Amino acid sequence: MNYWLLKSEPNVWSIDQQLKVGPKGADWDGVRNYQAANNLKKMKKGDLCFFYHSNIGKEIVGIVEVIKTAFIHPTDKEKRFVAVKVKYKSKLKTPVSLENIKKNKDLKDIALIKQSRLSVMPIDTKCWKIILKMSSI
């Protein structure tokens, strides 16, 4: 299993909206950056993703699971970009803010800090566990 982080503006798509769609999940679409799209293509069924609220809040708020691997999304008329389908797994007990992530020296190299504009990024197992621990404080 691999771990990822997905960014969404909560006024466009929030963790609460993800929860409301239930186990059928929802398409994670609209990704038009090539590096982010390539990350979507690497996802496998069962991979887990942190759900990050960008712009408003700037914090990791929950976890979703990949339930369908990359496919060309019908809204992409040029057939260049992909989407995956994800379902809600859980909200974090305590959201983990970008500010607190930046303060943790063990997280200094994660893409959320190094490539702040990237909307889909891998998270290594060590960082995944650190962030989960931070969420339980």
Model-derived features: where do they sit?
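Short, charged beta-turn/beta-strand-edge "cap" motif at the junction between a beta-strand
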Residues: 52-58
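Short acidic/glycine-rich loop or secondary-structure boundary segments that cap or lie
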Residues: 14-16, 58-60, 74
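Charged phosphate-binding loop/patch that engages nucleotide di/tri-phosphates or the phosphate backbone
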Residues: 120-137
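Short, charged, solvent-exposed linker or helix-capping segments at domain edges/interfaces
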Residues: 17, 95-101, 132-134
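Short, acidic Gly/Pro/Ser/Thr-rich loop/turn segments
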Residues: 11-13, 93, 130
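Loop/turn positions that initiate beta-strands
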Residues: 46-47
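Aromatic- and Lys/Arg-enriched surface recognition patch
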Residues: 61-121
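Compositionally biased, charged N-terminal/linker segments
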Residues: 1-43, 135-137
